[in-house]
């Protein structure tokens, strides 16, 4: 199981029905702003029936053991790694791609920001970094690749800060390797990460990374392949968009250092991936763990499963309760979305909300409003 509330809720029933079959889960990171731990807390909650927990970095492993109390013998780090054959700069013509994406500005340096545009990724901090960087140099362009709930706000703020023309918003892209191919540095200013896949991909393409010191980022990024910037914001303040000047300037200094010494980083980035973090290394380690766990399932977990078999109704009710909670959360999210997009919430029962949304959209059209006013006068 990995990152699935439903999956965790179903584990007791699965273990009760098939106690001999070992269970493994994979935890990407802890999230203190999400149920005080996120999926790390779920993993600890179901420890008595999980044979092995895999994590994507040593920092998360330490937290699972020290904070959540998991058995250190049952937690192992398996770095995700990257397909170094797919993410290889040799496959791409940098000059042609810069012409494609930058046009007449193809001689500018490129900073890439590839992620979901949401609170966790701190896109508004990126804007402050760009604005501060622009005070000392204008030889760069920023590629923002991705979508999310803060994308429109990010664009609006970029216009207000007079840096919109320094940014290219591409939306979601399948072939992000093209962006890495034209990039001089990748920026990750997240408030929370496990170990970002984009950091693996960037290094594999020979592109250094400037990253926040979060999760296991510094297990991958060191001074030879980028810069690790101290996080100066409390994780619980994830919705606070006020950032310290010290943190902004630290990013600017790191970016400047890399942009002024690009050639020194390129080979070292690729070499670090090849030596330690290829996808083949991940497959080999994970296969060994799966084989070992399958051949020697934990007897205590087996007995726990047999005990659960005597209480199947509890296991079933756990699944039902989880599904009902998901339904409530979904309804709440729909309501919040409707408030944000349409200015009001539509009841999901007893109302033709599609008709109501159509009326709202028509009312935004001046000609329609004029027509309705005329009708009211005629009736009136």
Predicted regions and their residues:
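A short, active-site helix/loop in glycosyltransferases that binds the activated sugar's phosphate group
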Residues: 48-75, 82-86
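Short hydrophobic beta-strand element within catalytic cores of glycosyltransferases
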Residues: 208-211, 221, 228
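Short His-centered aromatic/hydrophobic patch
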Residues: 1-7, 27
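A short, well-ordered alpha-helix in the C-terminal region of glycosyltransferases
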Residues: 257, 263-276
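Aromatic "clamp/platform" in nucleotide-sugar-dependent glycosyltransferases that forms part
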Residues: 172, 191
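A short helix/loop element that forms part of the nucleotide-sugar donor recognition site in Leloir-type
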Residues: 88-104
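Conserved donor-binding/catalytic core segment of Leloir-type glycosyltransferases
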Residues: 54, 104-121, 127-130
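Nucleotide-activated donor-binding/catalytic signature segment of Leloir-type glycosyltransferases, i.e.
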Residues: 155-171
């Amino acid at each position: 199981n990995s990152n699935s509330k439903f999956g965790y809720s179903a584990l007791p029933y699965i273990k009760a029905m098939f106690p001999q079959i070992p269970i493994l889960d994979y935890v990407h990171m802890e999230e203190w702003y999400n149920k005080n731990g996120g999926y790390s807390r779920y993993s600890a909650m179901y420890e008595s029936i999980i044979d092995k927990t895999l994590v994507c970095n040593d920092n998360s492993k330490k937290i699972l053991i020290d904070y959540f109390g998991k058995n250190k013998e049952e937690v192992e780090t398996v770095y995700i790694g990257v397909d170094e054959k797919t993410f290889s700069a040799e496959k791409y013509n940098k000059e042609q791609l810069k012409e494609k994406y930058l046009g007449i500005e193809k001689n500018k340096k490129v900073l890439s920001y590839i992620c979901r545009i949401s609170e966790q990724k701190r896109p508004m901090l990126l804007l402050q970094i760009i604005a501060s960087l622009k005070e000392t140099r204008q030889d760069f362009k920023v590629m923002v690749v991705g979508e999310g709930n803060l994308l429109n706000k990010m664009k609006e703020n970029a216009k207000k800060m007079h840096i919109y023309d320094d940014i290219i918003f591409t939306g979601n892209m399948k072939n992000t390797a093209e962006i890495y191919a034209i990039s001089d540095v990748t920026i990750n200013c997240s408030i929370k990460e496990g170990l970002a896949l984009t950091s693996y991909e960037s290094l594999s393409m020979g592109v250094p990374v400037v990253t926040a010191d979060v999760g296991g980022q510094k297990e991958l990024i060191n001074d030879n392949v980028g810069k690790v910037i101290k996080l100066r914001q409390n994780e619980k303040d994830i919705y606070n968009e006020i950032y310290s000047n010290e943190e902004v300037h630290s990013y600017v200094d790191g970016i400047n250092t890399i942009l002024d010494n690009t050639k020194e980083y390129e080979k070292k980035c690729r070499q670090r991936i090849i030596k330690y973090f290829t996808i083949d290394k991940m497959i080999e380690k994970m296969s060994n763990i799966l084989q070992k766990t399958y051949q020697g399932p934990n007897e205590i977990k087996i007995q726990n499963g047999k005990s659960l078999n005597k209480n199947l109704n509890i296991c079933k009710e756990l699944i039902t309760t989880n599904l009902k909670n998901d339904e409530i959360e979904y309804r709440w999210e729909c309501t919040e979305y409707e408030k944000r997009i349409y200015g009001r919430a539509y009841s999901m029962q007893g109302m033709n909300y599609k008709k109501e949304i159509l009326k709202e959209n028509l009312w935004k059209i001046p000609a329609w409003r004029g027509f309705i006013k005329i009708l009211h006068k005629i009736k009136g």
